[in-house]
């Protein structure tokens, strides 16, 4: 039997105070995956455009067509560098549309860009593109990862192994699958059933395939019970990220239609993870997608909102702010309207 670890939730919410700042004014970017490579901060975002697709059903207006790489020498740098287009939709043989939130991992001097896109049948798959430099350009593999589905890949290195996390509801199509197999028709669990979970799989040595079948990640309440589908304030929706702090594993994600960024804590990459609280209250705009990174012994939250576009959900701008822990290791909640 797996031992379940539980934590006492906050009796009072403590708030981090440092003001956030925008990172790039010239174009709209979102979903930033931040990493430090060669002592430089690299951002791997999605690239928002004012698309001709106006129907927001299932995220159709998030119609991204390429990826850029951005970089900073340090957090306080006034101008974020745009390395330009590093991968285009037309250069991905299997992909039809919608280059959503990516992530990058480094292994043995090579850089692997993991990205979701819809194939010719309209199903999201996860692809890989490779470069010899963190700033790209990247060359896509001819086919998506076998057995992949849904959106929002995030890759995590732990003890020399690389794990990929993924999944997203609604437009992210996670409801279309059970036990890694497609359903004849998408089916949401009812409110009293267990919520759908983000997925995890060990990556192969060449970083291009799953080394195992994806597994569900359990997210538990304070009593050790899986969060329910009707618990929209806490259950997983999309945008999973993982980091470690003081030998604990912090799984963070968006709650979707309640627009919160929240987290859970566990003791290994597979979990289970016990829900702890909010990292960020709702921002301007529908989506919340982030990364959490340690830089020069300080922790930062990278994320986006839609304030500069006047609240247009599909035109988002990147932000960064300092992330703080209290003395017990809980993350201090931040105000998304700052």
Say what each PLM segment does.
Residues 1-2, 39:
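Generic cytosolic/nucleocytoplasmic N-terminal low-complexity/intrinsically disordered segments
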Residues 2-3, 316:
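Basic side chains
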Residues 3-13:
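Sec-dependent N-terminal signal peptides
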């Amino acid at each position: 039997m797996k031992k379940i670890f539980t934590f006492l939730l906050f009796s009072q919410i403590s708030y981090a105070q440092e003001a956030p700042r925008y990172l790039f004014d010239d174009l709209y970017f979102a979903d930033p995956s931040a990493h430090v490579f060669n002592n430089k901060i690299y951002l791997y975002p999605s690239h928002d455009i004012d698309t001709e697709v106006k129907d927001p059903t299932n995220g159709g207006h998030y119609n991204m067509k390429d990826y850029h790489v951005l970089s900073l020498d340090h957090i306080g740098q006034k101008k974020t560098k745009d390395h330009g287009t590093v991968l285009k939709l037309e250069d991905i043989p299997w992909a039809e549309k919608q280059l959503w939130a990516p992530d990058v991992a480094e292994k043995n001097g090579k850089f692997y860009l993991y990205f979701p896109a819809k194939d010719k049948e309209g199903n999201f798959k996860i692809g890989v593109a490779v470069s010899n430099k963190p700033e790209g350009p990247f060359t896509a593999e001819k086919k998506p990862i076998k057995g992949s589905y849904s959106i929002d890949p995030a890759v995590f290195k732990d003890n020399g192994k690389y794990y990929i996390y993924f999944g997203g509801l609604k437009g992210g199509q996670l409801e279309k699958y059970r036990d890694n197999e497609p359903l004849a028709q998408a089916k949401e669990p009812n409110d009293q059933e267990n919520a759908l979970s983000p997925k995890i799989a060990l990556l192969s040595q060449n970083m291009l395939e799953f080394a195992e079948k994806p597994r569900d990640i359990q997210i538990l309440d304070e009593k050790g019970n899986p969060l329910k589908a009707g618990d929209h304030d806490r259950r997983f929706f999309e945008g999973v990220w993982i980091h470690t702090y003081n030998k604990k594993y912090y799984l963070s994600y968006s709650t979707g239609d309640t627009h919160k960024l929240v987290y859970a804590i566990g003791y290994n990459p597979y979990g289970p993870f016990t829900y702890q609280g909010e990292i960020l209250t709702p921002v301007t705009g529908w989506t919340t997608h982030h990364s959490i990174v340690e830089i020069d012994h300080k922790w930062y939250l990278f994320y986006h909102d839609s304030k500069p576009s006047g609240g247009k959900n599909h035109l988002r701008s990147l932000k960064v702010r300092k992330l703080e822990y209290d003395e017990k290791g809980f993350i201090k909640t931040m105000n998304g309207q700052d």
